[in-house]
């Protein structure tokens, strides 16, 4: 057996055995991208199930697990200190972070209240207090490092599918290189 054959065999074995651990998290948003994700899952389940382990996706299952994750998808803007702490925790447990949708990528429309007048802020203060929300809404990237962005409200399906394909290829290549260097 030639060394290149062994490397190829290892790569094939890795691709069959190792699924990417995926997390999907929602913060302040309407969760329209989560709806699009579940619709895409209907179309791509057989393919994705071979390569993705849906470790934490609350819309799909009740028993979710925390990281580590290969990829975490984060939908929604960050509106509270509790959300900021949670998104930092997710970042620490994830190789890659993908900001999903307009609220996560741009902060909007959730952050429209950042432009409110003092009178408008006074009108909504009871809601901010009730939910322990901060005065300002932040993009995910204002709180943590983001590796990929999928814009849109709801998310752009084409960019999402391209991002999934890119991440699967990149992580598998990284795994194969890691295995090869340990030979």
Predicted regions and their residues:
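Iron-sulfur-associated redox domains of electron-transfer enzymes in respiratory
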Residues: 3-183
């Amino acid at each position: 057996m030639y060394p290149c054959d062994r490397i190829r065999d290892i790569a094939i074995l890795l691709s069959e055995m190792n699924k990417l651990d995926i997390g999907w998290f929602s913060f302040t948003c309407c969760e329209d991208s989560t709806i699009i994700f579940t619709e895409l899952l209907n179309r791509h389940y057989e393919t994705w199930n071979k390569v993705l382990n849906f470790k934490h996706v609350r819309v799909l299952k009740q028993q979710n697990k925390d990281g580590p994750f290969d990829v975490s998808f984060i939908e929604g803007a960050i509106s509270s200190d509790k959300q900021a702490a949670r998104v930092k925790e997710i970042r620490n447990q994830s190789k890659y972070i993908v900001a999903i949708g307009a609220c996560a990528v741009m902060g909007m429309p959730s952050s429209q209240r950042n432009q409110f007048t003092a009178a408008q802020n006074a009108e909504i203060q009871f809601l901010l207090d009730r939910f322990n929300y901060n005065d300002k809404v932040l993009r995910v990237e204002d709180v943590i490092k983001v590796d990929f962005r999928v814009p849109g409200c709801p998310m752009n399906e084409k960019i999402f599918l391209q991002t999934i394909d890119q991440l699967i290829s990149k992580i598998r290549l990284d795994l194969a290189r890691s295995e090869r260097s340990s030979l």
